[in-house]
């Protein structure tokens, strides 16, 4: 009942309701209630309050919930500022996912290219893959310029996730590392497209 009332206030309440929700968030120790209030903040466009929770909440679960909501709200600038200041790798992964939710391919590309932590680079590359083949040229560019085999493997998987047959064929034709070439061919064998099948037949006939 309480969470239903919280959702109602977020959808239909005025300034007094917003203030009541803020006071409830500050006074409650119930994580589920706080999550419901954060959701209401998001629905009613109270970005500053969601941002305050994302930055200052002691509960990592609530921080991650607020960060996700910032992604839904399209708060790319605020998320990027948080990412640069955040020491926790796990929280940074949540920020990257929120950037993905908000369609922030530009910042994800920046992380995929230049982040020093390999796990965060891989997370950014994965998100770029899930965003569809419009990020294919970026992924190919990173693949061509980065000699790290693990990063290249992550890019191959991202290209597979987005169904980018052309990019995988290009890599399978030109890659000199036999393991990576084999991996590209393996991805193509699971894609079920005519173009991929034709390429695999071509390989068999060589």
PLM feature spans:
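Ankyrin-repeat and related helical/solenoid repeat scaffolds used for protein-protein interactions
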Residues: 149-192
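Amphipathic alpha-helical scaffolding segments comprising HEAT/armadillo-like alpha-solenoid repeats
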Residues: 14-27, 44-56, 73-85, 102-114, ...
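Eukaryotic tandem repeat interaction scaffolds
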Residues: 94-98, 107, 112, 117-143, ...
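Core register positions within helices of long alpha-helical scaffolds
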Residues: 8-11, 24, 40, 69, ...
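Alpha-helix N-cap/helix-start positions at coil->helix boundaries
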Residues: 15, 30-32, 59-61, 88-90, ...
């Amino acid at each position: 009942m309480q969470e239903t009332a919280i959702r109602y206030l977020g959808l239909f309440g005025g300034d007094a309701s917003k203030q009541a929700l803020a006071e409830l968030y500050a006074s409650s120790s119930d994580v589920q209630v706080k999550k419901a209030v954060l959701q209401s903040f998001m629905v009613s466009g109270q970005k500053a309050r969601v941002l305050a929770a994302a930055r200052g909440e002691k509960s990592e679960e609530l921080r991650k919930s607020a960060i996700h909501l910032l992604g839904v709200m399209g708060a790319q600038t605020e998320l990027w500022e948080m990412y640069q200041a955040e020491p926790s790798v796990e929280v940074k992964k949540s920020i990257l996912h929120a950037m993905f939710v908000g369609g922030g391919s530009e910042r994800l590309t920046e992380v995929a290219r230049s982040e020093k932590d390999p796990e965060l680079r891989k997370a950014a590359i994965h998100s770029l893959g899930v965003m569809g083949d419009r990020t294919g040229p970026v992924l190919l560019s990173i693949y061509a310029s980065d000699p790290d085999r693990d990063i290249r493997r992550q890019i191959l998987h991202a290209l597979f996730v987005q169904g980018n047959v052309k990019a995988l064929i290009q890599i399978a034709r030109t890659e000199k590392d036999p393991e990576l070439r084999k991996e590209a061919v393996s991805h193509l064998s699971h894609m079920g497209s005519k173009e991929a099948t034709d390429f695999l037949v071509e390989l068999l006939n060589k």
